[in-house]
């Protein structure tokens, strides 16, 4: 029971820190418009799925952001090591968060339905 609380807390802390690191420490223009939306930790804290959105709908920008995040992983982990009191910093797996786009499509469909009425 107590362990799941710790896992959630570590995930929230990593989300906050990674957003800050991307803003202040990573100089790569490919990740300028990236926002971390969620972090899901493995139960043993060995890895973190880091979900992100990008403020662009271009597929090329999405690919550039993914590449930029992967290139910045070393810097991000190093900064996490300075800022977090953890024995081992988890491996970071960056995944594009599709839920916001999906929600926007649903909203648009609902608006279109309202117009037809």
UniProtKB/Swiss-Prot annotation:
Annotated GO biological process: maturation of SSU-rRNA
Any Pfam family the entry gives: RBFA
GO cellular component term, pick one: cytosol
Record carries keyword Transmembrane helix: no
GO terms assigned for molecular function: ribosomal small subunit binding
PROSITE patterns assigned to the protein according to its UniProt record, in alphabetical order: RBFA
The organism's place on the tree of life at top rank: Bacteria
HAMAP family per the UniProt record, alphabetical: RbfA
Entry protein name: Ribosome-binding factor A
Organism annotation: Streptococcus thermophilus (strain ATCC BAA-250 / LMG 18311)
């Amino acid at each position: 029971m107590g362990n799941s609380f710790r896992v959630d807390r570590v995930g929230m802390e990593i989300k906050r820190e990674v957003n800050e690191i991307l803003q202040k420490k990573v100089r790569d223009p490919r990740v300028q418009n990236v926002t971390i939306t969620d972090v899901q930790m493995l139960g043993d804290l060995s890895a973190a799925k880091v979900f992100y959105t990008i403020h662009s709908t271009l597929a090329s920008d999405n690919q550039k952001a993914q590449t930029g995040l992967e290139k910045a992983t070393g810097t991000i982990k190093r900064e996490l090591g300075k800022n977090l009191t953890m024995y081992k910093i988890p491996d970071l797996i960056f995944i594009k968060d599709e839920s916001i786009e999906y929600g926007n499509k649903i909203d648009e469909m609902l608006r279109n339905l309202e117009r037809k009425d």
